[in-house]
Amino acid sequence: GIFPYGFVLAASIFIPTLQLTFVTGKAPFQKLSPIAAGIAMFVTVWALGLAQYFFLLNWAEGPGRPPAPPVAGFGPIYALDWPAMLLGMLILQMVFFLLLKGFPFNGIRNAGVRFVVVNVFTIGGGLLLHWALRAVGMSDGQISALAGIITAAVVIIEILFDGWPFTGPDRAATRLGKITLAAVITAALYALLFAIGSIDYPNSPGTPPVELWMAGTGLNLIAAWAIVHAAVFGRWPFRVAGAAAPPGPVPAERSERQPVDG
């Protein structure tokens, strides 16, 4: 079957897509026409995903591992270890570039410098975050669950509810309020999904941990439905009168995210 091989490739494409959309603000393609930019981004993320698959990852067989696919890479990292590392990057993408709208990096005036800094931060920082979480005893499954649920919490706050109730002029207080609310929602969802997922969950060799179900529920059900609810149904009935329209690909404060070349 296509699982888990296609899952690894999809994750390797998904994270660069978010990077170009939320983190870099479509740079370096922001000056192209919408169609040209879309094609360029599509080709770029697929090229990056395939490069990861073939040159960074491997499917070395071993006890408890699935058989290698007919077409496998020859990199140094075992393929099923890679998605959890990517999800460390996802946490930073969601918190800093969706929830906090690019803060504090939108204070960097030079667009080229900002492009380099945000990429180094999310890629290098994401790998360091994964290492730190592993160092404190979290499994890759738990890291995946945490990333999926943080994503769900941020999407609920920023896309479904448009940041409400933290929409006042005091940006520092707004950021603090959003971070606190995201932490509360994350903790509540993690506990709830773990309790639900553990009911009669099979505990046999070869069965994926319940945390992978939690990650999938957070990403594919909760976050995806919140995005559809905002984009298709206009947040009804949750939309606050006078709230902005559902955010586009880069939900950012224009005053803080306009590229300024130095």
Predicted regions and their residues:
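Cytoplasmic membrane-interface regions of multi-pass membrane proteins
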Residues: 14-38, 62-67, 92-116, 154-177, ...
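Membrane-helix interface and helix-disruption motif detector
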Residues: 1-10, 29-35, 54-87, 105-112, ...
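Intrinsically disordered, low-complexity regions
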Residues: 12, 71-77, 84, 88-100, ...
